[in-house]
């Protein structure tokens, strides 16, 4: 249980536990894990508190680094050539644990100060540790779903932080932007996600169904596609 592990402050054992998990997973042919979850949580009503490190961004950042290095064998992508390592995925970007009233998938209303200084440090720590992938969160941040948030996925993550890996949605995250009422249909949801900087659609089928048409119509640039598959 990650929350229980965090109470120990034993970073080396947390790194080692991730390394053991990577060793066992890779032996079964698994190359990618959807971990670590690094979301800061301040509301005990949220049902996923136990998956993270709790409410302290400093401790959360240390643990994010330890787990990424455990899964990937170090802080350099070259270590992924080792057969005993797996790709790590930093999730859920961003502020998933800030959902109002602890309701999963809910909106998050956050000042820039609170967002950047309280919720963002563990994600940045994972990036600095060399995490290969990020997963977008389901929630809105100040009215904009993370899966369609260009400021979050492109301006902050890639341009400001210099992230060079790829971003995957959470399960049907693109489809669910229709329920957020920010787009009218699945096709528009796919365009919003692609233009925001989402590289992979997890199980939703939106990209495979609509993306070629959206490129032909000029709604999504070929440059965005090239970047996503590079």
What are the roles of these predicted feature ranges?
Residues 1-230:
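Glycoside hydrolase catalytic-domain context in secreted enzymes
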């Amino acid at each position: 249980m990650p929350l229980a592990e965090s109470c120990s402050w034993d970073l080396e054992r947390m790194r080692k536990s991730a390394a053991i998990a990577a060793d066992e997973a890779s032996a079964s042919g698994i190359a990618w894990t959807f971990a670590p979850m690094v979301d800061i949580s301040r509301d005990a009503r949220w049902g996923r508190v136990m998956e993270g490190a709790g409410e302290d961004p400093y401790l959360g950042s240390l643990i994010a680094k330890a787990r990424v290095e455990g899964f990937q064998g170090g802080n350099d992508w070259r270590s992924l050539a080792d057969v005993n390592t797996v790709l790590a995925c930093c999730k859920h970007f961003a502020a998933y644990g800030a959902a109002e009233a602890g309701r999963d998938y809910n909106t998050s209303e956050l000042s820039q100060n609170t967002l950047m200084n309280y919720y963002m440090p563990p994600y940045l720590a994972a990036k600095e540790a060399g995490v290969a992938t990020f997963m977008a969160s389901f929630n809105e941040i100040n009215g904009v779903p993370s899966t369609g948030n260009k400021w979050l996925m492109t301006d902050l993550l890639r341009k400001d932080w210099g992230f060079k890996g790829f971003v995957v949605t959470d399960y049907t995250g693109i489809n669910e932007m229709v329920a957020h009422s920010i787009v009218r249909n699945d096709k528009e949801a796919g365009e919003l996600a692609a233009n925001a900087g989402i590289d992979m659609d997890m199980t939703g089928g939106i990209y495979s169904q609509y993306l070629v048409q959206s490129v032909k119509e000029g709604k999504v640039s070929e440059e965005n596609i090239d970047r996503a598959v590079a």
